[in-house]
């Protein structure tokens, strides 16, 4: 079922072809788009299955509603990631497979990463190699690695590693100390490269649900 996550990387291949609009009036977004809104980078991608509607709100707030979706990714954050402390709060209400996670990419090496805070019915760790644990922000996280072979990425079709930290005590609000995860991954030989974008991401796959998240 790790292929669930691989479906989402198509978003990253597609975004290189998008124009990046500036500040936008509040409106429902239903097709692939990246840009800035109220000082935050945002990204939305869907494969077109089912019904998915994304809305940017004030500052770092966004909401997304989906029904019988194919697959989608959505969220707000920063155009350039870093080892920052990320605050998030709100509601995450999936019926089926969905993730709420800090999500980003690096280059040299090319890495796709997740710090997963909450998820629906499916824990993707069951399909990946367990590497260790890290304790951060009030919970143990299990660390996993997985190789994606000839899959879409931010640089086109490529082979690259995914790194994951999956929180045992799921939550929809709190602070993510990303440095704790990046350092733990590095100690396990899972090094990152130069940061590309970094968002608090709501993803869904063949599911329904809603989320309203504020990022800072």
Curated annotation (Swiss-Prot):
Gene Ontology annotations for the cellular component aspect, listed alphabetically: extracellular region
GH11 domain ranges (all copies): 28-216
pH dependence: Optimum pH is 5.0-6.0.
EC number, as in UniProt: 3.2.1.8
A GO BP entry: xylan catabolic process
Residues glycosylated per entry: 87
Gene Ontology molecular function: endo-1,4-beta-xylanase activity
Chief place where the protein resides: secreted
Catalytic activity field: Endohydrolysis of (1->4)-beta-D-xylosidic linkages in xylans
PROSITE patterns for this protein: GH11_1, GH11_2, GH11_3
First and last residue of the signal peptide: 1-27
Keywords: Carbohydrate metabolism, Glycoprotein, Glycosidase, Hydrolase, Polysaccharide degradation, Secreted, Signal, Xylan degradation
Temperature and activity: Optimum temperature is 70 degrees Celsius.
Active site: 112 (nucleophile), 203 (proton donor)
Subcellular localization(s) per the UniProt record: Secreted
Reported function: Endo-1,4-beta-xylanase involved in the hydrolysis of xylan, a major structural heterogeneous polysaccharide found in plant biomass representing the second most abundant polysaccharide in the biosphere, after cellulose.
The protein, known as: Endo-1,4-beta-xylanase 2
Annotated source species: Rhizopus oryzae (Mucormycosis agent)
Lineage of origin: Eukaryota, Fungi, Fungi incertae sedis, Mucoromycota, Mucoromycotina
